[in-house]
């Protein structure tokens, strides 16, 4: 049993929620053992959460939660919008290593509709560094085509690793 955690942070990202709620995505996730889902839908107005097959998927869905770190800590796969805060929560694996055996796979989906498409830049840089996998909405299903061993993990317990990455990004 694998836990899939989807988060859109405080934004409205209906397209991401609709994509993960689609029958095709559900089937792929189930085939790969993700039968427990937590979906944080933020200010989304879509009603597609009801399309998730609860006879096959254990589901917890909410707009906001004061204890969201708990879900980052236990997820096996994190699908996040491209917000820097959410990405950092997903990749800061060492903070959670006391609670878990491994760092989760983190997949980011930039929300291109936001001002100046600002999420794409940080997502692309982190993807280039092998920290996260980055997908567009229409290619999100491809995350199930990769073996777990293909995901590179970056240990961010050393603050200098993150500082160097951030400095490179900003320069």
Regions found by a protein language model. Name each.
Residues 1-171:
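Nucleotide-activated sugar donor-binding and catalytic core shared by glycosyltransferases
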């Amino acid at each position: 049993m694998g836990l899939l955690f989807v988060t859109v942070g405080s934004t409205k990202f209906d397209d991401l929620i609709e994509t993960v709620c689609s029958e095709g995505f559900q089937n792929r996730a189930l085939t790969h053992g993700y039968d427990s889902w937590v979906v944080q839908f933020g200010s989304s107005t879509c009603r597609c959460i009801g399309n998730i097959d609860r006879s096959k998927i254990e589901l917890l869905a909410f707009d906001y939660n004061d204890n969201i770190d708990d879900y980052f800590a236990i997820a096996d796969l994190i699908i996040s919008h491209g917000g820097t805060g959410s990405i950092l929560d997903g990749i800061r694996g060492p903070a959670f290593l006391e609670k878990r055996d491994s760092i989760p796979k983190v997949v980011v989906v930039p929300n291109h509709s936001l001002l100046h498409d600002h999420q794409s830049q940080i997502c692309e840089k982190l993807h280039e560094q092998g920290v996260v996998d980055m997908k567009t909405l229409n290619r999100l299903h491809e995350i199930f085509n990769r073996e777990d061993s293909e995901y590179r993990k970056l240990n961010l317990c050393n603050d200098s690793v993150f500082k160097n990455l951030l400095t490179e990004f900003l320069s």
